[in-house]
Every structure is written in C-alpha cells, then in structure tokens.
C-alpha cells in the first residue's frame, strides 16, 4: 500500500499487515528498486512516518515533523526505522538516545537495506563516522534514484561533515535526474554558501521561491542565505515574506530575531526571540532560542547582564535534562570571560556537564562533538593567557580523541588546538598548516590571521581576517571573534600602512 504522495518528490513507504515481512517482498519490483524500503505493521505508522518526512525534510516544519515521527512509533512500537528517524532528527539528547536504542532493538523487523539506513542514522549520532559513511555509500550505490536518500546524505555531508564537494556532487547529479526536486535545490544553495561560494546560492533561491510560491521555507531559506551574505535588509524581507505565507513558520521568526542581533539591534532581537520561544513546543528548541536571546547581551557589551541571563537559562536547561545545551552555555560564558582562570573554570563546568555522571542522557557522538568544542575553546583561552601547561594538556586530550573518533568536528578541533599550541611555541609555519584544517571556525581563523602576520604573510593574514569578518551566523564563536576582525579592518582602512606589503 502506498502512502499519499503529498509532493511529487515523496518516497513511497511500503507497509505490511499482520506479521512483518521485508518491504521489498510486499511491493512492486520497480518501487523496491528505486527507494529504500520501509517496513511497518501499521498503516497509521506508515502514513505518520511519511508525513514526518514531508514536514521535516521537504517543507522544513521541524516541530511538526518530529510530532509525526512520534505518532509513527506510537502506532507501531516495533517500527525500527521510525525510531531511528525520530532519534536522528530530535534535538532532545535523551529522546535521541532512547530512540536510537529502540531502533537497534527492533532492527530485525526491517529489510536488509532498511537496516543499512538505520545504521547510518544511528552511526552519525554515535560518533561512528567511518561506519556511517560505509553504510551511506552502500545505500547510494544500491538506490541511485532515491531522491530523498540522496538529499539527506548531501545535507549531512555538507552541514555535519564539511564534505562540501561530495555533497554538492550528489545534489548536482540528483538535480540532473530530476530538476524539479526542490529540496535538493535548497540544500545545494546551502552547500555552496557553507563552502564559501554564497554568490552561487541566490539564483538557486530564485528558482526555489518561484517553484513553491505558497510555501514558507523557500522564502526562509532565501532569508538565511542573504543573512549569510551580510545583506540584512534583504534577509528581513524574505523572512517576513515567509511569515506572511505562514505566520506559524517559526524558523523565520527566529531568523528575524537573529538578523536583528547581527545588525546590532539587540533590544529588538530579544523581543523577537521571545516570540520565537513561544512559537515552539519543543523544550530543547526553546532552550536553544533562549541561548541566542542571552547572547544578545554579550553582543551589546553587557557582560554582567549576559552572565546573569546565561545562568538563568542554564538552570532551565539543567531542569530539562538538556546536557549539551548546558555545556554550550558554559562554553559561551568562558569565551566572553575576561579572566582566564575563571574562564577555564567555566570550561571545567562545561566538561562536568558531559561527565560520566551526566552523559547517560547522551549519545556518544553528541557528547564527543560538544566536548571537542569545549577543549578547542580551552586550548584557545589557555594559549592567549600564556598558560602552556593547560594548553598542552588540552591538546593531548584532543589528540587522544582524534585517534578514535574520525568525525569532522573532533578532527578539526584537534588540528585547531594543535595549531594554537604551535603558535604559542613560535612555530608559525606549523601553526598555519594546522589552523587551515579548520577553515570554518572563527577561533581558528582569528589565530590563523595572527600566525600569518607573525610569519610575514601580510596579504594572507588580511585575507583571513576578511573571511572571518564576513562570517554572519549565530554561533557563539562568531559573536566572539568576528566583531574584532571587523574593527581591525575598519581601523586599517582609516589608518593605511605606508610602504609596501606582500
């Protein structure tokens, strides 16, 4: 039985009645060959799962998609792929871990290739990057025309692994196969933008908006792309267009708030964040928005109010069991803490949030990715404060992590920390090589520019500073490192250096 195709790019879900059987045995050969099978005993579960993918992946209604996945596993508690999808997409660490475990518990109910998809979803969250890529490659080889699979794969490669060229190649190939598969158009624009080719994204956004004029996400994505390009008025226009189409499209509401924050209108940003917080029922999302709300006080150089706000949000995150968010809060406070010893204490608190007594709520991948960011910040702060023992100890911890965890966040954090240590030791050439391995992180870019300056690479240092200054996103590292870069460039423009430069 096929679920309703709400959009022309929907994958076909195959279900069984009574005893579970492999989906490919219950479906026509053409369907089985074109898309990864989906096995469930419940028509209600199958329809809810399909609607979860429609809302979460295709229309980008995140909260609604999660709710459909929850309905799917409620209708069929042994629906392995349903559990895997809920665990994969959930921002609640406990829910993600619990659902991942249930997916493995019932994985025998799934078809063999469906099991590969479950393993890919789980492995991405468990820090098993090599295994995840292996499963993904097998699936892409077996299902070259499964559009949603290819789109999800490319999204993960670009957004989580920094494998931009690989993700772009998958999407370009997919759009040649079906130029009207608009989720791929959307993701290709993001891949270009994240890969430093944002100028290639607006034409794709024009296609996306024209193709789906009554959907809010095309306007929302266009808004985010323009924000990444630093065109804040255009970003606000597109976000507001999305809200005119659907006032409940909360991603655009938080987009408006973050755009005001980046423009420096923190009072208006805080008011808009509060609207966004009220617009979601997901507790983890509410806390994420509260973190952005608290960050506005740091942006306007009110550190006391910022710390008070973050401590209040930390209490809420702790009560909700959101350990990753707790760690992120302490990491933010550390970066903006002018006292190095106190900042390192903040990072000790962040590590404690992820400690053995608390990590039971976390999947290993979530824990190690956040821990890598904490240790990277620790190395950065220690080097800037001249605390070499702390810097060396931190670099060693990351080196040990990097030997067993091949995820991009862990690997990049290690190279960044090693680069910071080499910089402190006066090995500027070595520092440059290591810091260039982490080209998207504002902390690494800040130190890379300094290392290039020390090495006499003045033109390269300025180019790196310009790259850093142009970053326009919501990360705490950007809020910390990008404004000084912009000030430095502004100072250079008004006080040009006399004489030549390389």
Tell where the protein language model's regions lie, with residue ranges:
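Residue-level recognition of tetratricopeptide repeat
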Residues: 44, 78-79, 146-147, 181, ...
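Position-specific recognition of the canonical hydrophobic site in helix A of tetratricopeptide repeat
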Residues: 56-57, 91, 124, 158-159, ...
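Canonical tetratricopeptide repeat
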Residues: 85, 152-153, 187, 221, ...
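Alpha-helical segment of the N-proximal tetratricopeptide repeat
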Residues: 41-71, 75, 115-134, 152, ...
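Structural marker of alpha-solenoid helical repeat scaffolds
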Residues: 75, 106-109, 142-143, 176-178, ...
